[in-house]
């Protein structure tokens, strides 16, 4: 346990950030899973709408500092390839 006052405050702040980041990451996983299931079922329309939603959530995660921009770009590229292959 921290003895320094500022470190005690940082522990609280870090815990809030961790919970917020986990929520964002969970939404991302759900969105990407939706794209993958639409691709597996060969539903072009559903895959396209899920791709737009997932891309948006990836961009938001970057702006919130949850993901690095290159990581998001790689993920968007991977799911786009799957959708375009339909």
From Swiss-Prot:
Pfam families with a match to the protein in the record: Ribosomal_S20p
Superkingdom assignment: Bacteria
Keyword Phosphoprotein belongs to the record: no
Signal peptide: none
A GO term from the CC aspect: small ribosomal subunit
Key words, A-Z: Ribonucleoprotein, Ribosomal protein, RNA-binding, rRNA-binding
GO molecular function, one term: structural constituent of ribosome
Keyword rRNA-binding appears in the UniProt entry: yes
GO biological process, one term: translation
Transmembrane segments: none
InterPro entries named in the record: Ribosomal_bS20, Ribosomal_bS20_sf
Family: Belongs to the bacterial ribosomal protein bS20 family.
UniProt function note: Binds directly to 16S ribosomal RNA.
HAMAP family xrefs: Ribosomal_bS20 (MF_00500)
Record-given protein name: Small ribosomal subunit protein bS20
Originating gene: rpsT
